[in-house]
């Protein structure tokens, strides 16, 4: 599971700037759930090959008693409680403030690991600017500039190293055909996740159940269906009650992000009797950005009249149109209707995510697509797409080689994606297109000559 790093500090010390820098990579997952997570932002960050979940909190005043400031303090305390390590950010230009001492005292009492980062140190002598902050008693202050990126990689590397977590090769684990498929059932509260989970698993087929200990402990439920092993990655906050599981914890963004990152296929649950919410769209966005195979289950379908059903279909098509690669299944988790077809699509989505795409066939499809519709000209020339090969699985990545590929428009990439999808029948999985422009050896040679001094 990806570790959780929470950034705390008094207002205007640069927390959001650091957060944005850490989650700026291609797979950044950023959301702001108003109300649910007031002034708390969640993102998936990456430094090199090391992935983590990052939480940006509001300006922290832990002694606030009333109003919005008190609510922000409450949210920050909750964020600290569910984190693996805390980055306490202070302002190196303004120096020590009374609030910093109060926050440091609070963090010490939580028992969470803390790294003290002194921000805005660009152009300053680090030894001088960090000297005052030693009195906080949180170890050696780490000088950084979140605006310029100075020291940020070292800060995160230190944070991850201090946790003593051996980072697995996620792609290698995910692509191991001998491992059972991992499924996550996600969705906002009260859409019927625990009901569906109990129907899918079946009381007699539960093999084991691990109770959670710390924030990092995954709740995984191995089970079998039609003789095939699966692992359910829980986001519903399940607890065993006799022979069934019940959801007794409130919705957790962190658990949802961790489950999505840790699984092979996501079942996104929607409520047919309620409008698509911003929260539904955020969760769907997490899934797409993480590159996970997806099946959409629209629950509580039974008993609806034809008008309401059609309205629900149209709303999903409109508000979640970026999920057009995924199949949508009307179900009743309570009655168990529609689950057979749902699970067929879970298997099909996983197969599509793990599909092997031969280079000769990819290149042939590419050339046929170009013959049918060429990319638009850029200036005097036109991008030249020469050949394609597979660059990864789960999700499938198609790498296209050629020249002047920076001029290929997003609409043309979507056109190519559609061609590859149609031929390889890649339903249920995101498909990534990457452009790889060939280097010009003559240009590189000229640059080398210009750089030499005689």
UniProtKB/Swiss-Prot annotation:
<feature type="domain" description="EngA-type G 2">
    <location>
        <begin position="181"/>
        <end position="354"/>
    </location>
</feature>
<feature type="domain" description="EngA-type G 1">
    <location>
        <begin position="3"/>
        <end position="167"/>
    </location>
</feature>
<comment type="similarity">
    <text>Belongs to the TRAFAC class TrmE-Era-EngA-EngB-Septin-like GTPase superfamily. EngA (Der) GTPase family.</text>
</comment>
<dbReference type="InterPro" id="IPR032859">
    <property type="entry name" value="KH_dom-like"/>
</dbReference>
<feature type="binding site">
    <location>
        <begin position="119"/>
        <end position="122"/>
    </location>
    <ligand>
        <name>GTP 1</name>
    </ligand>
</feature>
<dbReference type="InterPro" id="IPR027417">
    <property type="entry name" value="P-loop_NTPase"/>
</dbReference>
<feature type="binding site">
    <location>
        <begin position="56"/>
        <end position="60"/>
    </location>
    <ligand>
        <name>GTP 1</name>
    </ligand>
</feature>
<comment type="subunit">
    <text>Associates with the 50S ribosomal subunit.</text>
</comment>
<dbReference type="GO" id="GO:0005525">
    <property type="term" value="F:GTP binding"/>
</dbReference>
<protein>
    <recommendedName>
        <fullName>GTPase Der</fullName>
    </recommendedName>
</protein>
<dbReference type="InterPro" id="IPR031166">
    <property type="entry name" value="G_ENGA"/>
</dbReference>
<dbReference type="GO" id="GO:0043022">
    <property type="term" value="F:ribosome binding"/>
</dbReference>
<keyword id="KW-0342">GTP-binding</keyword>
<feature type="binding site">
    <location>
        <begin position="9"/>
        <end position="16"/>
    </location>
    <ligand>
        <name>GTP 1</name>
    </ligand>
</feature>
<keyword id="KW-0690">Ribosome biogenesis</keyword>
<dbReference type="InterPro" id="IPR016484">
    <property type="entry name" value="GTPase_Der"/>
</dbReference>
<keyword id="KW-0677">Repeat</keyword>
<feature type="binding site">
    <location>
        <begin position="299"/>
        <end position="302"/>
    </location>
    <ligand>
        <name>GTP 2</name>
    </ligand>
</feature>
<dbReference type="GO" id="GO:0042254">
    <property type="term" value="P:ribosome biogenesis"/>
</dbReference>
<comment type="function">
    <text>GTPase that plays an essential role in the late steps of ribosome biogenesis.</text>
</comment>
<dbReference type="InterPro" id="IPR015946">
    <property type="entry name" value="KH_dom-like_a/b"/>
</dbReference>
<feature type="domain" description="KH-like">
    <location>
        <begin position="355"/>
        <end position="439"/>
    </location>
</feature>
<feature type="binding site">
    <location>
        <begin position="234"/>
        <end position="238"/>
    </location>
    <ligand>
        <name>GTP 2</name>
    </ligand>
</feature>
<dbReference type="Pfam" id="PF14714">
    <property type="entry name" value="KH_dom-like"/>
</dbReference>
<dbReference type="Pfam" id="PF01926">
    <property type="entry name" value="MMR_HSR1"/>
</dbReference>
<feature type="binding site">
    <location>
        <begin position="187"/>
        <end position="194"/>
    </location>
    <ligand>
        <name>GTP 2</name>
    </ligand>
</feature>
<dbReference type="InterPro" id="IPR006073">
    <property type="entry name" value="GTP-bd"/>
</dbReference>
<keyword id="KW-0547">Nucleotide-binding</keyword>
<dbReference type="InterPro" id="IPR005225">
    <property type="entry name" value="Small_GTP-bd"/>
</dbReference>
């Amino acid at each position: 599971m990806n570790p959780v790093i929470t950034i705390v500090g008094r207002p205007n010390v640069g927390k959001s700037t650091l957060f944005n820098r850490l989650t700026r990579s291609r797979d950044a997952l950023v959301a702001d759930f108003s109300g649910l997570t007031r002034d708390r932002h969640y993102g998936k960050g990456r430094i090199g090959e090391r992935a983590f979940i990052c939480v940006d909190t509001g300006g922290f005043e832990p002694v606030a008693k009333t109003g919005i400031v008190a609510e922000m303090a409450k949210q920050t305390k909750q964020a600290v409680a569910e984190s693996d390590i805390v980055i306490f950010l202070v302002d190196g230009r303004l120096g020590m403030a009374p609030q910093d001492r109060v926050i440091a005292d609070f963090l010490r009492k939580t028992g969470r690991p803390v790294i003290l980062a002194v921000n805005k140190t660009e152009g300053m002598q680090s030894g001088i600017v960090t000297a005052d902050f030693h009195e906080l008693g949180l170890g050696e202050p780490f000088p950084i500039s979140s605006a310029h990126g100075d020291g940020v990689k070292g800060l995160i590397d230190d944070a991850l190293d201090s946790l003593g977590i051996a980072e697995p090769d996620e792609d290698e684990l995910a692509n191991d055909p001998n491992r059972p498929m991992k499924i996550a059932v996600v969705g906002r509260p009260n859409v019927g996740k625990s009901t569906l989970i109990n129907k899918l698993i079946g009381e007699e087929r539960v093999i084991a159940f691990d109770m959670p200990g710390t924030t990092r402990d995954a709740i995984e439920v191995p089970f079998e269906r039609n003789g095939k092993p699966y692992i359910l990655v829980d986001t519903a906050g399940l607890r065993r009650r006799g022979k069934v599981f019940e959801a007794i914890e409130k919705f957790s963004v962190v658990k949802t992000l961790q489950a999505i990152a840790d699984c092979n296929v996501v079942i996104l649950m929607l409520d047919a009797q309620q409008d698509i919410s911003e929260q539904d769209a955020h969760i769907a966005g997490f899934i797409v950005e993480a590159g996970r195979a997806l099946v959409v289950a629209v629950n509580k379908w039974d008993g609806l009249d034809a008008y309401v059903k059609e309205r629900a279909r149209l709303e999903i098509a409109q508000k979640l149109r970026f999920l057009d690669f995924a199949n949508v299944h009307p179900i009743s988790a309570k009655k168990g209707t529609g689950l057979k077809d749902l699970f067929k699509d879970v298997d099909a989505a996983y197969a599509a995510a793990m599909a092997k795409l031969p280079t000769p066939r990819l290149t042939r499809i590419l050339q046929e697509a170009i013959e049918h519709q060429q990319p638009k000209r850029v200036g005097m020339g036109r991008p030249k797409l020469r050949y394609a090969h597979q660059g990864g699985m789960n999700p499938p990545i198609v790498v296209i080689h050629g020249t002047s590929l920076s001029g290929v428009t997003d609409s043309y990439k979507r056109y190519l994606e559609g061609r590859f999808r149609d031929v390889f029948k890649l339903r249920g999985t995101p498909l990534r297109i990457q452009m790889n422009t060939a280097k010009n050896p003559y240009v590189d040679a000229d640059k080398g000559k210009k750089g030499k001094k005689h």
